[in-house]
């Protein structure tokens, strides 16, 4: 590990030196950051089976629920934002690969990446992974869902007037993850 850092500082280009010398919250390569965004997007695929398995229970708990649960809209928003962050990381990698950078510019790019990754992780975590995890927990345990409703936590509360159906959002998660991976591979 320390020999890798020494090699990057002594023999690497300006970006490798900046990446080795700059303290970062997420010490991942740009490719790793792009793939992390893709993995989070792929988690949205679990939304459809998690809600479909509890269709009867949802009808009992939310009798007037014709619209999909509000968490579906949250996951849709998170998917769009996470996909955009993934594209920004693809562009960032293109900049690093095609431009000659000095150490100061490279350091600024590394810090910018870290800030962007902070937002990408928080968006993906809060808007995709947490809702999917809650809905999966509900799919695995109907007793948990009933308990949450007794505590006035309406896990399947409907979203009024939403175009984001469960199937569309699950499919969009798979498509966006695939597109991001294809763009990442094509620009490598």
Mark where each language-model region is:
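Haloarchaeal acidic low-complexity proteome signature biased toward cell-envelope/secretome components but also
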Residues: 1-37, 92-116, 185-188
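Transmembrane-helix bundle segments that line or gate the permeation/cavity pathway
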Residues: 1-13, 135-142, 171-172
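The first (N-terminal) embedded transmembrane alpha-helix
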Residues: 33-52
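Membrane-interfacial helical/loop segments at transmembrane boundaries in membrane proteins
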Residues: 57-65, 137-160
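Alpha-helical transmembrane segments
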Residues: 63-86, 168
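Alpha-helical transmembrane segments and their membrane-interface junctions
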Residues: 46-52, 123-151
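Transmembrane alpha-helical segments in integral membrane proteins
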Residues: 78-95, 171-188
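Transmembrane alpha-helical segments of multi-pass membrane proteins
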Residues: 77-78, 106-130
